[in-house]
Design a protein with these regions (language model features):
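N-terminal subdomain of nucleotide-sugar transferases
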Residues: 2-53
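Acidic donor-binding loop of glycosyltransferase active sites
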Residues: 104, 271-272, 287-298
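A nucleotide-sugar donor-handling region in carbohydrate enzymes
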Residues: 2-9, 53-58, 77, 154-227
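Short alpha-helical segment that forms part of, or immediately flanks, the ligand-binding pocket
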Residues: 283, 300-306
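Short hydrophobic beta-strand element within catalytic cores of glycosyltransferases
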Residues: 129, 292-294, 298-299, 309-314
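Active-site and donor-binding regions of nucleotide-sugar-utilizing enzymes
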Residues: 21-24, 29-36, 43, 63, ...
């Protein structure tokens, strides 16, 4: 794939404000940064760049729609033929973009491959702000753990969700003046969208009864691509369907669907595969589920919010808990 690197038509407004480049690439980044992006546009001259890491509409565009976000100013289309090409494209494309637009600062969130765009910013001496800094699960088999360590170390300002995460960074050698506790922005995002979430008609559309279904999300590389983990996970899903005898709605990412099809694994008849849902629909399902089973890092934050507003969701997380 030939990577488009012509950003000559992309520019800041040059309105005298700090020029901030925000880089995203996946669903979790878009969701968590939604309120932050809108607030930053009030104070800074902002450009929003999307690497294209999540290239499916249901993992990308639907969230800009639901969260009422302006479309990205730049779409890098950096997905390559394999992981190495994609990672290289992300670093290359973001570097060329920064050379062209000359931002005063770069903001990223989390631990995805899109966050590796800050490597170019470091070489160009552009200050880097990293939200969700200091999170650790201490399992180096997970690709996100490597990304977390890289981005934390080279960022100029690490914005942590908790005092625990800040202390961890300080203990590992990151200077105190480079670490700040801001908390997670998820509560603001969910609060701003709570009316739309509660008014979703997704239960009627899917013919599900509130409190009488289990919501499943499983997409992590180590759970889907590793044969042993894949078989263990979906055997457990089938056992869960049999034990509880209720529908299990599986929000199935494209890679997970392909893996299930190629393996020939037979899911229990009560497991319903569904394409990934939008923000309002999915969270309405989550807040009214009998239980939520997920390997996502975002869903525990969402479910904890719904518990605080009176909706109980039970959570099982396949990834070791991120200490934050």
């Amino acid at each position: 794939m030939e990577l488009k690197l012509d950003y000559s038509q992309v520019r800041f407004q040059e309105n005298g404000r700090l020029k901030l480049l925000i880089i995203v690439g996946t669903r979790p980044e878009i969701i968590r940064l939604a309120a932050v992006i809108n607030k930053c546009r009030s104070y800074f001259d902002c450009l929003l760049a999307h690497t294209g890491q999540n290239y499916d509409y249901n993992l990308n565009g639907v969230f800009f729609r639901d969260l009422k976000l302006k479309a990205p100013d730049v779409y890098m289309d950096a997905v390559g033929d394999d992981l190495g090409a994609t990672m290289g494209n992300i670093i290359n494309a973001s570097y060329k973009l920064m050379v062209q637009v000359k931002p005063d600062a770069v903001l990223v969130l989390g631990d995805t491959n899109s966050c590796l765009s800050v490597i170019g910013a470091k070489r160009l001496h552009i200050p880097i702000f990293h939200m969700e800094a200091g999170n650790r699960c201490f399992d180096e088999c997970l690709p996100e753990e490597t990304n977390r360590r890289i981005v934390d170390v080279i960022s100029d300002v690490n914005l942590c969700y908790s005092e625990h995460a800040r202390r961890y960074l300080n203990a590992s050698g990151v200077a105190k003046e480079r670490t700040y506790v801001t908390g997670s922005p998820m509560a603001e995002v969910l609060h701003e969208n709570l009316t739309e979430i509660e008014s979703s008609d997704i239960h009627q559309r899917l013919h599900l009864q509130k409190g009488k279904y289990i919501l499943l999300s499983a997409h992590r590389e180590e759970n889907i691509d590793t044969e042993k983990n894949f078989l263990s996970l979906f055997s457990a899903v089938n056992a869960m369907a049999e034990k509880y005898d209720m529908p299990i709605l599986y929000s199935c990412h494209p890679r997970s669907r392909k893996r299930l099809e190629s393996s020939g694994f037979a899911l229990d008849r009560r497991v319903i595969q569904h394409e990934p849902l939008g923000f309002h629909d999915y969270n309405c399902l989550q807040m009214n589920a009998y239980a939520v089973v997920s390997d996502s890092g975002t869903l525990p934050e969402e479910s904890s919010f719904f518990t605080s507003v009176g909706h109980l969701s039970l959570i099982h997380i396949s990834e070791p808990t991120r200490l934050a």
